[in-house]
UniProtKB/Swiss-Prot annotation:
Polar residues composition-biased segments: 363-386
A family per Pfam: PGBA_C
InterPro entries in the record: PGBA_C, PgbA_N
Taxonomic source organism: Helicobacter pylori (strain J99 / ATCC 700824) (Campylobacter pylori J99)
Major localisation: other
Renumbered residue ranges of the record's region Disordered: 262-450
Gene Ontology cellular component terms for the protein in this record: cell surface
Organism domain of life: Bacteria
Role summary: Binds plasminogen, specifically, and in a concentration and lysine-dependent manner. Plasminogen is the precursor of plasmin, a serine protease that cleaves fibrin, fibronectin, laminin and vitronectin. Acquisition of plasminogen/plasmin could enable H.pylori to degrade host components.
Record's compositionally biased regions (Basic and acidic residues): 262-273, 284-310, 317-362, 389-450
Subcellular location(s) per record: Cell surface
Protein name (Swiss-Prot/TrEMBL): Plasminogen-binding protein PgbA
Further remarks about this protein from its record: Plasminogen bound to PgbA is capable of being converted to functionally active plasmin.
Amino acid sequence: MLRLLIGLLLMSFISLQSASWQEPLRVSIEFVDLPKKIIRFPAHDLKVGEFGFVVTKLSDYEIVNSEVVIIAVENGVATAKFKAFESMKQSHLPTPRMVAKKGDLVYFRQFNNQAFLIAPNDELYEQIRATNTDINFISSDLLVTFLNGFDPKIANLRKACNVYSVGVIYIVTTNTLNILSCESFEILEKRELDTSGVTKTSTPFFSRVEGIDAGTLGKLFSGSQSKNYFAYYDALVKKEKRKEVRIEKKEERIDARENKREIKQEAIKEPKKANQGTENAPTLEEKNYQKAERKFDAKEERRRSRDERKKTKATKKAMEFEEREKEHDERDEKETEERRKALEMDKGNEKVNAKENEREINQESANEPSSENNATLKDTENTSVLKESAAKKEAPKPSSKEEKRRLKEEKKKAKAEQRAREFEQRAREHQERDEKELEERRKALEMNKK
């Protein structure tokens, strides 16, 4: 019990001494090296590894254009590496094309009041929460559920921080409480913490969630290394420590090159021409910014040319489509005219055939002998009777031929009408299809113009 009270007092004292890095900070950029993607600004109380983001102020709104990580602090000046802002990456939102420039503001520690806590058991978990009352610890149940039974990896922890808007992670290792930045995973602070009394640990860390299983393949790939709590997290933090040492050495080399470049730049500076007065030549920062602007303008010019080519191609396709539509209309009109002429010719043939039939019938009736002129002669009567009977036998034949001719003409007429209807149906379908294609092409052309 006495050991617990001493630990609580010690943790409270340390938390009060280190509360400054938890407070939000805003600084102005004083130097930008676009080719190297390096910026410099007053350090204040910033530490290596702290994460921030660059904000550019426009006429009536602000844009986050970059995210930064401090890589060196020397003589009150902080050096940071910047890159495109990806912490809230969203493919359905527009991507800013601006870059960091002198005068932009850098925001730090905006989410450092929220943290994840990774502890081996409930005792240390509650102890750390009680001694850091100014921090809003997100429940470890959410983090273990997010990991879904897999061992905590740096990439997964960063994703969880972005999802829950967390700025720092507290990780308990052997006799140490490590406070790391979520985005850079650099160690911001170390505090002494007695872990000698820990006899039983939770996997992958303490939480109230149980029964999460990553499955057979998950266990195969993840390895369940976090069952050995202190060995796993000691190695995880040491890995980041080695990375920190490599970054420091790299930044020392970068600083040396920057100093040489600045000395050389100062040596080759010359005054401008007399008509430009006594103004000095552009500084290295201005040249780098102008170079970046020219590169950006060239990229914009290529994009504009590509858009113009697309627009020209779409216009050409629309014109071709209109030309094809005209050809379709002309062909359809020509076919319609031919069909009408064919129908008129069929009707003319019907009239001619009807006249011929009528003339044949009249001629046959004129050739028959008159029964009234031969009424007085008996032989003539017999002959007339025989002729009448013969005429009666032959009469059905012309009538049968006429019926066949009439049926044949009706069939021709019905067939011609059916062909005309089919042609009109095809013409309507062609016209509807062409109108639909024309409307789609016009919509595509309007989209390209926009």
